[in-house]
Design a protein with these regions (language model features):
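Alpha-helix-loop-beta-strand connector modules within alpha/beta enzyme cores
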Residues: 43-61, 105-108
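Conserved, mostly hydrophobic/aromatic
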Residues: 17, 95, 128
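Conserved small/polar residues in nucleotide/adenosyl-binding loops
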Residues: 134-143
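Catalytic cores of alpha/beta
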Residues: 13, 122-127
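Active-site-adjacent beta->alpha loops and helix N-cap segments on the catalytic face
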Residues: 37-47, 96-105
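Hydrophobic faces of well-ordered beta-strands that scaffold small-molecule active sites
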Residues: 4-7, 25-27, 60-64, 91-93, ...
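Glycine-rich, proline-tolerant flexible connector loops at the mouths of alpha/beta enzymes
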Residues: 26-44, 64-70
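N-terminal basic/disordered segments at the start of proteins
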Residues: 3-24
């Protein structure tokens, strides 16, 4: 299934994407995103963004696309929990350890392979299927792996 996916760094961009036909929005929160110094939504704003997107029949994904250290995994749980409860549609993940962690603690949460994961062949794509990935997002990869 093809999906028009748009980035959003703030509520204004998110609303513009929804109002201009995006099927889904992706954004970073206050932690674990590759664009740590970019403008990102607060926890409260992100929960409101989830609600707004769902009211308009769209999906919303959050990036967890940094490499995590062992000590950060408990932080990841506390970080994702409010968004999971609010109905976040999925996470875009880079770190394979985070994949295992999210799969164990948030088993219903769809995971998308971040472009930083650099999956460029069918062996990599097949492996991701075995660890609960539902989407592969790599700029370099054609749709017909």
């Amino acid at each position: 299934m093809k999906e028009l996916l748009s980035p959003a760094g703030n509520m204004e961009c998110l609303k513009a994407a929804v109002n201009n036909g995006a099927d889904a929005i992706y954004l970073g929160g206050s932690a674990f995103g590759a664009r740590a110094y970019a403008q990102n939504l607060s926890e409260e704003d992100l929960v409101q963004a989830i609600e707004y997107v769902h009211i308009h029949g769209r999906k919303i994904y959050m990036t967890v696309n940094t490499l995590l250290k062992d000590r950060e995994l408990n932080e990841l749980y506390a970080y994702l929990l409010p968004y999971y409860k609010a109905g976040l549609d999925g996470v875009i993940v880079q770190d394979i350890g985070a994949v295992k962690f999210i799969g164990e603690y948030f088993p219903e949460m769809p995971m998308h392979a971040s472009t930083q994961m650099t999956i460029t062949n069918t062996l990599g794509a097949d492996f991701l299927k075995t660890v609960s990935y539902t989407h592969l997002r790599a700029h370099e990869t054609k749709a017909n792996l």
